[in-house]
Amino acid sequence: MQNINPTQTFAWNALEQHKAENLTIPQLFNEDPKRFDKYSLRFEDQILVDFSKNAINQHTLALLRQLADECQVKSATYAMFNGEKINRTENRAVLHTALRNRSNTPVEVDGKNVMLEVNAVLAKMKGFCERVISGVSKGYTGKAITDVVNIGIGGSDLGPYMVTEALRPYKNHLTMHFVSNVDGTHIAETLAKINPETTLFLVASKTFTTQETMTNALSARQWLLDTAKDESAVAKHFVALSTNAKEVAKFGIDTENMFEFWDWVGGRYSLWSAIGLSIALSIGFEHFEQLLDGAHAMDKHFLNAPAEQNIPLTLALIGIWNNNFLGAESEAILPYDQYLHRFAAYFQQGNMESNGKYVGRDGKFVNYQTGPIIWGEPGTNGQHAFYQLIHQGTKLIPCDFIAPAQTHNPIGDHHPKLLSNFFAQTEALAFGKSKEVVEQEFLQAGTSLEEVVEIVPFKVFTGNKPTNSILVQKITPFTLGALIAMYEHKIFVQGVIFNIYSFDQWGVELGKQLANRILPELENNETITSHDSSTNGLINQFKLWKQ
């Protein structure tokens, strides 16, 4: 990957000039009644992406695609898919795409076809899932497994939890639990719900040394042994998603039940790997494979579709337009599907940990905005919480609205009511309500304007708020896999254009280092003076109150 400062490209400077045209969404629709047809794309006739409600025209898109060309997005894409070590700061390839490479075409890293190992781990996962789900695998008292607890953090938790929640309509009889926080409350509340005789723990840590994960795993291990009274029970109730065979065996786990993944799998892209074992146990391996199929189909689309029809590329470029030229600082992801209630949180990590960087690939501080803040909640809950600010606040917040045409729970008229809100919100954000319309509504209600002249400004909506509408035929393992991969590739494209390394996360390290230094200070009764006055004061008050 080349070091290309995007602000030095012809396209970037042309976009700066183009911004002065002050395009507005209502104006663009007035000029082109068939705008929807020209500014929407379809994937496999199962996903429709409508980006027409953005302040863009064909000239905007042409310049944005030229920016992608000047920043060599296509060659960077080939480099990633081909196993080149594009994660330069860690000297690693980036191959989450290989994990779902259903075509099974060879992918080489250091002259070795990684697909052989990928397929071997998938086969091992399949056999394990079949034994647990069928009841062949039993706990230390001979009872079948009923509950599965995934112990991980970050990508080892967010992805599996999001997907198992999103695909709950496909779940089997196993009850899934997820523990991530080192706060003892999280593991304690989970253990209170389950039976040690029928619980399986998945410990997800590549190194098997992650502080939060191993703290929780050791507490779970002790909880099991308090009942079982026999160390051999650990091997029947714990498996490892790890590469550290020595530590796994030391813990008491049979290394035959250690599921490997590789250093070219980033945590926030790892749900496709052995880290997804909890997903496969929850929905069955056949459905897990369909999840991989959907992601692979989107991978092929991203790799092969021309720029004009390329969904991840288009979404990435529109995001850059809103972020770097129109001044948006955040993006909201708003799924109108309760099963997707963790989707925004998942891509909060996916985007902000990937592109929240201020150092370019040239090692210098950038002088432009990089990744946006990502946030969101399911509709319609958000409408009664933060939509007020999106509609009438002073910040520009582009939104992605996601909804299924078909619901898994067709109860009464719930779904039409939900979708009516989905459609209404993007229309309201785009077109707003003028002063004249507000006044006319008062007149039609029999109220004179003299009575309400002071109220009218508060009921005006300026509109011109950008949104993407992503309509899915139905949330299935296939369409969910495609949606996740779509956002992954959007993030990748933006990172290439931002000229940053999207696949490291050095920003998480400093806090961990300082926490390791502070921990011993919390275990004695001495007054602490080794930090700044604020940190000293907080630690000393904690020590006083914990007595």
Curated annotation (Swiss-Prot):
Lineage of producing organism: Bacteria, Pseudomonadati, Pseudomonadota, Gammaproteobacteria, Pasteurellales
One example GO MF annotation: glucose-6-phosphate isomerase activity
PROSITE patterns assigned: P_GLUCOSE_ISOMERASE_1 (PS00765), P_GLUCOSE_ISOMERASE_2 (PS00174), P_GLUCOSE_ISOMERASE_3 (PS51463)
CDD domains, alphabetized: SIS_PGI_1 (cd05015), SIS_PGI_2 (cd05016)
Name this protein carries in UniProt: Glucose-6-phosphate isomerase
Annotated catalytic residues: E353 (proton donor), H384, K512
UniProt record similarity statement: Belongs to the GPI family.
Gene source species: Glaesserella parasuis serovar 5 (strain SH0165) (Haemophilus parasuis)
Subcellular location: Cytoplasm
Task performed by this protein: Catalyzes the reversible isomerization of glucose-6-phosphate to fructose-6-phosphate.
InterPro entries the record matches: G6P_Isomerase (IPR001672), G6P_Isomerase_C (IPR023096), Phosphoglucose_isomerase_CS (IPR018189), SIS_dom_sf (IPR046348), SIS_PGI_1 (IPR035476), SIS_PGI_2 (IPR035482)
EC number: 5.3.1.9
Matching Pfam families: PGI
Protein keywords: Cytoplasm, Gluconeogenesis, Glycolysis, Isomerase
